C-alpha cells in the first residue's frame, strides 16, 4: 500500500491537470506497450479512444499528445522508423493501479485499447498469407502482448469477449508462423479461456475452432504424448467446423469458412501421418483436396493448394511413393513461391519440407541446395535461436554427415544444439540433434565427447524405451541405428524424418 501511495503522489498533480479527454487517452495508452506506441495505431478508426476523439479530428489528437509530452507524461521515440511514443513504466503502473479502483473506467479503457489494436492489425485470413501485412503485425505485436499481460495481472477481473479472443487467435497464428511457440501458446490459451466463458453448453464459435486448431498444432512439437492430445483436440476442431457449416443456411457459407473445414481435415490427417497411420492420413488429405477443388483451383487458391500438396507429399513419402512425393513437394514450393515470393517464411517451409523428400530419394546435393536457400531466408527473418533455423541447421549437418563431410557436419550440428533448452526447439528435436552429433563423434573416435552427447540424448526418453533399444539391438552398430530411429520418430513430422518409412530409397548411414 505504501508503494502504491508513493507512486500516486508522484503523478497525481500532473494527472489532475489534464482535461477529461486527454486523461481518457492516457488511460487507454496504459494498456499498451510503454516502450513503443505507434502514432499510426492511435490514428485508427473513429471513436476508438473516447466518445469525442476521431480520426477526422486528427488535430485534436495532436493537441492532446503535445500536452502529454509537454508535461513529460509521454515522450517521442526518435530512434524508431515511424512516429511513436514512450511512457515511463512507473507512470503506466500508477495508471493501471488507479484504474483498478475505477472498474467502469478500467473496462472502458481496456475495451478501447483492444479496439485500437484490433483495428490496426489486419485479420489473418487462412485462405492465403498476404506478405505486405507481416510488417504491420510485427510492429504492433507488442501491443497484443501488453494487453494480454494487463488482462491477466489486473487486481480485479476485466471482461473480454470475442473481439479480444479473435485478436489473440490471430496473434497466435502469426507467432506460430514465426515459430515463437512459447509466446503463442499462452496467448492462445487465454483466448480459449475467454471464448469458453462466453459460450453456453453445446454452442460453437469459429474463434474457438481457430484457437483449438492452433493449440493442437503448436503442442505437436513438444512430445509424442502431446501429439496424442493434439489428435483429440483436432477431432474436436473438425466437429466444431462441421457444426458451424451445418448451422448456416444453404449456400451462405463463406469461402474462408469452407476452407477452415478443409484445414481441420488436413491438420488431423497430418497428425495421422505423424503416427504412421497412413490410411487415415490419405483419406483426410484427399477429402480436404476435394473440397478445395470444389472451391477453386491452383490459380485462385494457390496458397491452400500449396499447403495441401505438401501434406499429401508427406503421406506419399511415408507410403514409399517417392516419385509422387517429389512431384507434389516441388509443386507445393513453386505455388507458394508464386503466391508469397521466394523470401517468405512459408515459402522457406515448403522448401525445407521438399528437401526431406529429396534426402529420401538420395538426392543429397539437391536437398542441400534447398536447405541452404531456406536457411538464408530464415536467418534474414528470424532470430538465431529460432527453432526453424536450428532445425534447418540440423538437416544441413545431417546431409553433410551422409556425404561424409564430417567437418561441415559437425559445424552445423553444433550450431543446431548451441542454445539447448533455452530455445523454443522441442526436446525431441534437441535430443535427435545431440545423438546425430554423437554418431559423428563416434566415427571420429572421439569417445569421451560422443558419450556425453549420447547420454544427453538418451536422457530424453523413458527407461522403457531405452530397455527396448538394448533388447532389440544386436551389437553396438545395430543399437545405434535403433536409437537414431527411436529419437527420429519422436520428432514432429513437420520437422522431418529420415528413418523408418521416411528413410526412402537412401542407403548408407541411418
Regions found by a protein language model. Name each.
Residues 11-103, 107-122:
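C-terminal boundary/linker of central alpha/beta nucleotide-binding cores
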Residues 148-149, 192-200, 235-250, 286-297, ...:
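Amphipathic alpha-helical segments of tetratricopeptide repeats
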Residues 20-21, 28, 111-190, 194:
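Extended alpha-helical scaffolding segments used for macromolecular assembly and cargo binding
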Residues 134, 158-162, 199-209, 226-228, ...:
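Helix N-cap/loop-to-helix boundary motif
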Residues 1-2, 43:
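Amphipathic helix/helix-loop-helix segment enriched in hydrophobic residues with interspersed Lys/Arg
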Residues 166-177, 206-223, 256-274, 300-318, ...:
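Conserved alpha-helical positions within TPR/SEL1-like repeat arrays
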Residues 137, 181, 225-227, 278, ...:
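TPR-repeat structural position
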